[in-house]
């Protein structure tokens, strides 16, 4: 792709998200979402393969439908109450429609079907953008309007997302689909705590983005797209492989690592608000995610796929690529638990 065209695409992508996050009028919010959608489409179909074209079509149809629902709900709210502001959403019909539109854009259940297919059909770098940057604009809208939303609908979708994010990843061997189902589960955790403590949602979002960037950075540099290719990384880049495995454990919420922090704080907050049954169910469903992370770690580190080369390690290791920001991301992804008591803002 032409470097100038690529620059224009990324500028449009960033501008669309910033416009949506800083707008207080529904029309400018919708305009920012449209800019965001049209900027990501050329990146998804960069490879010009049938799978990429299929992923682009699915992404366009889902996102365009969600934008249409959002604009329709904003129009209904204006016709009933004469309000175009984002925060003021007194119409229950309009608020429910907007919530459905945001769930479609975030890939939350029951509108989650497009996320694994689109993520699998494109490049690793584009999958990273879809699972991180593309979540910011819809989450910023949800953050502003959650007081007007029905909390029962949000909690039901959150529980369903956590369940599907765990069950959907059990049979997967493609790493991009595993990360997609992990994203669905993380969106469920964020939306569940939003109605009780929005600051915890921001903490969870920050850590989720750091985990995902760390994972995809390693996968991109090792060109690993499946469980089989991941098992061959021990021969080439054992240090990066060890970092990847620790990041996977952290994403699963294993206690000594950073990923345990948001789950611990979220469950504590929900128990404080007398939602013991919901928090217990969420904790049990989180074990599904931890299970397929552990299975991925076992199959990639403790087993070897059949190969014509009987050597377990190469006689000469490849140089680890220079990734100046990866050590910082890795430390945050793994070793942030000791500073948790300093996070008094999230209490």
UniProtKB/Swiss-Prot annotation:
Keyword Aminoacyl-tRNA synthetase (UniProt): no
Its membrane topology: Multi-pass membrane protein
GO terms, biological process: mitochondrial electron transport, NADH to ubiquinone
Entry keyword DNA damage: no
Places the protein is found: Mitochondrion inner membrane
InterPro entries according to UniProt: Complex_I_Subunit_2, NADH_DH_su2_C, NADH_UbQ_OxRdtase_chain2, ND/Mrp_TM
GO cellular component terms given for this protein: mitochondrial inner membrane
UniProt keyword list: Electron transport, Membrane, Mitochondrion, Mitochondrion inner membrane, NAD, Respiratory chain, Translocase, Transmembrane, Transmembrane helix, Transport, Ubiquinone
EC numbers, comma separated: 7.1.1.2
Superkingdom: Eukaryota
Pfam families: NADH_dehy_S2_C, Proton_antipo_M
Catalytic activity annotation: a ubiquinone + NADH + 5 H(+)(in) = a ubiquinol + NAD(+) + 4 H(+)(out)
Membrane-spanning ranges: 1-21, 25-45, 59-79, 96-116, 123-143, 153-173, 178-198, 200-220, 239-259, 278-298, 325-345
Family from the record: Belongs to the complex I subunit 2 family.
Function: Core subunit of the mitochondrial membrane respiratory chain NADH dehydrogenase (Complex I) that is believed to belong to the minimal assembly required for catalysis. Complex I functions in the transfer of electrons from NADH to the respiratory chain. The immediate electron acceptor for the enzyme is believed to be ubiquinone.
Assembly behavior: Core subunit of respiratory chain NADH dehydrogenase (Complex I) which is composed of 45 different subunits. Interacts with TMEM242.
Name this polypeptide is given: NADH-ubiquinone oxidoreductase chain 2
Source organism: Oryzorictes hova
């Amino acid at each position: 792709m032409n470097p100038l065209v690529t620059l224009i695409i990324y500028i449009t992508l960033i501008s669309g998200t910033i416009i949506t996050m800083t707008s207080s009028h529904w029309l400018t919010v919708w305009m920012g979402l449209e800019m965001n959608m049209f900027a990501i489409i050329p990146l998804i179909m960069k490879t010009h393969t049938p799978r990429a074209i299929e992923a682009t079509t699915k992404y366009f149809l889902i996102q365009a439908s969600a934008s249409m629902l959002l604009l329709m709900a904003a129009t209904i709210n204006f016709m009933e109450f004469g309000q175009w502001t984002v925060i003021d959403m007194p119409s229950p019909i309009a608020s429910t429609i907007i919530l459905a539109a945001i769930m479609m854009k975030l890939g939350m259940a029951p509108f989650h079907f497009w996320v694994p297919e689109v993520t699998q059909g494109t490049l690793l770098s584009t999958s990273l953008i879809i699972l991180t940057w593309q979540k910011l604009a819809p989450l910023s809208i949800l953050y502003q309007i959650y007081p007007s939303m029905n909390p029962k609908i949000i909690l039901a979708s959150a529980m369903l997302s956590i369940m599907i994010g765990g069950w959907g990843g059990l049979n997967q061997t493609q790493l991009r689909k595993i990360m997609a189902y992990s994203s669905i589960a993380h969106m469920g955790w964020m939306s569940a705590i939003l109605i009780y403590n929005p600051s915890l949602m921001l903490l969870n979002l920050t850590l989720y983005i750091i985990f995902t960037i760390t994972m995809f950075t390693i996968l991109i540099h090792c060109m690993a797209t499946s469980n089989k290719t991941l098992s061959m990384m021990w021969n080439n880049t054992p240090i990066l492989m060890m970092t990847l495995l620790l990041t996977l454990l952290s994403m699963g919420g294993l206690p000594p690592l950073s990923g345990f922090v948001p789950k611990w704080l979220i469950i504590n907050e929900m128990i404080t608000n007398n939602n013991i049954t919901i928090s217990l169910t969420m904790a049990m469903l989180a074990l599904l995610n931890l299970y397929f992370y552990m299975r991925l770690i076992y199959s990639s580190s403790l087993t070897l796929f059949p190969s014509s080369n009987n050597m377990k390690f190469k006689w000469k290791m490849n140089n680890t690529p220079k990734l100046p920001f990866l050590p910082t991301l890795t430390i945050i992804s793994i070793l942030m638990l000791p500073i948790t008591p300093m996070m008094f803002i999230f209490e």
